[in-house]
Amino acid sequence: MDVTRLLLATLLVFLCFFTAYSHLPPEEKLRDDRSLRSNSSVNLLDFPSVSIVALNKKSKQMSRKEAEKKRSSKKEASMKKVARPRTPLSAPCVATRDSCKPPAPACCDPCASCQCRFFRSACSCRVLSLNC
């Protein structure tokens, strides 16, 4: 009886190894450098060569001036985009992504609905379908 258990255990171990190794991809053995070069997916000739160019003082100053102009234009653009205060909604409703925990009024957007999480401790108005 011990012999049959030993054979069954050996068979079980063999089957485990066989199933584990059957799912692994076969390894390709490269014999030399030539096969490595031919099998490599990245070819070094595909990349463009890099050229290093020395900058003179005039080009550095021009680039600094251009950078300052860009910075000043960005500052002016940001000053133009002053945040306007939101006007309060006349109807008693909850805006999208705001808290709608009951007994709050309904959501303002007709496509939105109040969704609660964490045992109704965090509720917010969310739009469920974009086709609405």
Curated annotation (Swiss-Prot):
A single MF term (Gene Ontology): melanocortin receptor binding
GO term, biological process aspect, one: melanosome organization
Bias (Basic and acidic residues): 63-79
Domain of life of the native organism: Eukaryota
PROSITE patterns xrefs: AGOUTI_1, AGOUTI_2
GO cellular component: extracellular space
Signal peptide extent: 1-22
Pfam families named among the record's database cross-references: Agouti
Record's comment describing the protein's domains: The presence of a 'disulfide through disulfide knot' structurally defines this protein as a knottin.
Function per UniProt: Involved in the regulation of melanogenesis. The binding of ASP to MC1R precludes alpha-MSH initiated signaling and thus blocks production of cAMP, leading to a down-regulation of eumelanogenesis (brown/black pigment) and thus increasing synthesis of pheomelanin (yellow/red pigment).
Protein name in UniProt: Agouti-signaling protein
Natural source organism: Cercopithecus mitis (Blue monkey)
Gene name tied to this protein: ASIP
